[in-house]
């Protein structure tokens, strides 16, 4: 029986500081690492040199744990559903391109989920189509609360 993990968050080095003041940003030192997105700062969690950011370490950990396949997904605090839509569109495209490159050559072990610019449903739809049809990603992750509008807003 194949063991498949569909809840495997990842952060890519390429995404760090892409949005300037919004982040994402990693800082601190060995004893007090932190990860910041906007005004939110997650302290005490090491990202660099862990399976969270290093695919080699992730594949090694999967092997050691008997996990045959992981579908990588964006870190939920990097969905950026509340920033300017143009920035979100640029970030999502860059993140999704990076996701596709990361799994390239590891398709037997890794898949990927996209992140979408939910500020603009039309652009989110276009990006989902691009990610699944052109980049080979499996689908997308979104936050349940992605705008100040109701989920059934007709936009």
Residue ranges of predicted features:
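Histidine-centered catalytic micro-motifs
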Residues: 3-13
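Catalytic domains of carbohydrate-active enzymes, especially glycoside hydrolases
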Residues: 60-70
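Hydrophobic faces of well-ordered beta-strands that scaffold small-molecule active sites
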Residues: 4-6, 70-72, 112-114, 140-142
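Active-site mouth loops of central-metabolism enzymes
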Residues: 44-52, 112-121
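Distinct, well-ordered alpha-helical segments
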Residues: 121-133
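Single conserved hydrophobic/aromatic residue that forms the stacking wall/gate
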Residues: 146-155
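Conserved, mostly hydrophobic/aromatic
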Residues: 7, 62, 99, 131
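Active-site gating loops and adjacent loop-to-helix segments of metal-dependent hydrolytic enzymes
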Residues: 12-52
